[in-house]
Amino acid sequence: MKKLKLHGFNNLTKSLSFCIYDICYAKTAEERDGYIAYIDELYNANRLTEILSETCSIIGANILNIARQDYEPQGASVTILVSEEPVDPKLIDQTKHPGPLPETVVAHLDKSHICVHTYPESHPEGGLCTFRADIEVSTCGVISPLKALNYLIHQLESDIVTIDYRVRGFTRDVNGMKHFIDHEINSIQNFMSEDMKSLYDMVDVNVYQENIFHTKMLLKEFDLKHYMFHTKPEDLTETERQEITAALWKEMREIYYGRNISAV
């Protein structure tokens, strides 16, 4: 897409939001409580603040304000307001390609916010526990938050990821014509690295005329030992391993597809 010569400030709002899910099997009530306590401490408000603050530092954003809160019995949230450092719009790369990895990120945000909320969850029957983190990066100006996508997913790799990207509003060029998007995009996957795409099965649901893009990601490899909390697969019978594997895989598919699946 040819670079636009705008009249005044770029008034487009670009919002990137995604949910990450971590799934675990905890055999007993004590193990379930232990997992919830572990994941709640791992992603408490202070830890989330460190992650988001480091994100701001990497992308070159100025932190204006931080609001954070831990909740009882579990969960946390952090919201950071940031502003952009001076940047020449002509120097901004608007091409579609995977965002850089953490060690190479250099970018700017403008009058923007980054927020995260966590939702640990378990049920007394079945042994399944889930952890969900909602993250949103919203910007106004020439910068797309998609540039931060690759870094954030690398930081928060999980079993399932759902991503939404939307461009709202319009901006005008020097001739007064309105533009409702200022960069080319046909899939969020264009902004992911090849190694990231190789780890997940992905599907897109896009509404191009509304500038709405959606991608769902499900981890390809399944190894039971990575889903057990304080229990080793080798300590279980073959029947138990098969039953737990089936329960975990069903849980992951239900979250991925967003609907309950009947047992076969």
From Swiss-Prot:
First and last residue of the signal peptide: none
Record-linked SUPFAM superfamilies: S-adenosylmethionine decarboxylase
Protein family according to the UniProt entry: Belongs to the prokaryotic AdoMetDC family. Type 2 subfamily.
GO BP terms: spermidine biosynthetic process
Keyword S-adenosyl-L-methionine applies: yes
Organism: Salmonella choleraesuis (strain SC-B67)
Self-association state and partner proteins as the record states: Heterooctamer of four alpha and four beta chains arranged as a tetramer of alpha/beta heterodimers.
Class of the enzyme per the UniProt entry, highest EC level: lyase
Stored Pfam families: AdoMet_dc
Keywords of this entry: Autocatalytic cleavage, Decarboxylase, Lyase, Polyamine biosynthesis, Pyruvate, S-adenosyl-L-methionine, Schiff base, Spermidine biosynthesis, Zymogen
Modification after translation (UniProt): Is synthesized initially as an inactive proenzyme. Formation of the active enzyme involves a self-maturation process in which the active site pyruvoyl group is generated from an internal serine residue via an autocatalytic post-translational modification. Two non-identical subunits are generated from the proenzyme in this reaction, and the pyruvate is formed at the N-terminus of the alpha chain, which is derived from the carboxyl end of the proenzyme.
Entry note: cofactor: Binds 1 pyruvoyl group covalently per subunit.
Catalytic site positions: S112, H117, C140
Cofactors named for this entry: pyruvate
InterPro entries (UniProt xref): AdoMetDC_fam_prok (IPR003826), S-AdoMet_deCO2ase_bac (IPR009165), S-AdoMet_deCO2ase_core (IPR016067)
Protein name: S-adenosylmethionine decarboxylase proenzyme
GO MF, any single term: adenosylmethionine decarboxylase activity
Catalytic activity reported: S-adenosyl-L-methionine + H(+) = S-adenosyl 3-(methylsulfanyl)propylamine + CO2
Record-level GO cellular component terms: cytosol
